[in-house]
Structure formats: structure tokens, C-alpha cells
Amino acid sequence: FSESFGEEAGAHFTSRDIIYLMTDLLLSDADLSKGGNVTVYDMAMGTSQMLSCMEERIQELNTEIGVTCFGQEFNPSTFAIAKADMTIRGGDPNNMRFGDTLSEDQFSGYQFQYIISNPPFGIDWKREKTAVEAEAKKGELGRFAPGLPKISDGQQLFVLNGLSKLAPNGKMAIIQNGSPLFSGDAGSGPSEIRRYILENDWLDAIVQLGTDMFMNTGIS
């Protein structure tokens, strides 16, 4: 399965070990004893396995909690699988939406308690350039006010998308390669995005994964 889809531009499949690490980090200090409902969002959901693992972990902590999952995906094949999987699991398939997250945001105005995602590594955003730049000009009304990364790597755009959708006291776990940590000179778009994250105290931790964790990629 991963050989069929994983080599498409920047696409890669995430092992369950990594997903469970992310879910456990997100839920490490969560108070879920009171029940209720929580929302989970994946901006590049693939086949929605991160969403299903997050739901599983939350309900292991408290079976009385309702979990509502939301996701967006641009690959038609994996989107179809995600929507079918959500239906089988008894969720709302209408919360699984098709489209390019950077240029066709299907969840504008939404806020989520948990965001978990593994968006594409090092893929350019030339196709989305017009839409992204137009949204950046909206300032605080858009997702990309803090700055724009270099055109050759859109990873930081996904980070900004996630931050724009966090509910108060919400948490996000996102996988990136090393580029967003170091790219760009002082005062450049990538640098200003990092400044925005740090000055607003958005960053709790950076976890370095081992090598060869992603199939069908040269990512170490």
C-alpha cells in the first residue's frame, strides 16, 4: 500500500509507533475525567490513521468521552479510504473533506482542541502561491500573517494553518524535517515564523526521531 502511494510528491506513511508517541505527548497532561466531547483535526490526513489512533487513545482514558474527528486530504485515493474508514468507525464522513489545505481551506473559522498531522516534507507551494499570498495580505484575518517561507518548502505554512485553528488551551503535534528549524536568514519569512512561534510561547517541545522512519523516502 505504501509503495503505491508513498512516493507521490512528499507523501509518506507514518508508523503507528510514531502516531502513538504523538498522541501520548498530546494527552500527557490532559484532564479527561469529566467526559464531554473533544475535537481532533488532521490537516493532511492521508487515510485518517492519525485520527483513528487519537480517538482510540482518548477513549482508552475515558470511554465516556465523545471524539469528533475532522480531516482534509488532497490525494483522491487516500481521501476515499479516509472517508470510508470514518464511516466504518461510526463517525461523520462529512467531516472528512477533500481539497488542498493551503489554498482550499475546508475548515475556515473552525477551532480544535487537538491537532495531529504529518504534512508533506519539503514540497514547494508554487501551485498555491496566488492563494497563499492573497491570504497573507489579510493579516490577522488570515492564516499566514506571521510570514511566508521560501517557495521551495511549504512545511511552515502547515504549521501556521494548525496554529490558526487551535482552540484556547489546544495542543498540536506535527511532524517536520529539520528545514523549518534552520532555513532562512534573520528577518526572512522562515525566521519571522519561528519568531512568532517562540514569542507567543507556542512551542512546548521538539522530539528528534530516529533514522529511516518513513518508508519510500530518503528522509533520515
Model-derived segments and their meaning:
Residues E8-A9, S103, K137-E140, G210:
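Glycine-rich, flexible loop/turn motifs
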Residues H12-S117, G122-E133, Q176-S179, A186-I193, ...:
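Conserved S-adenosyl-L-methionine
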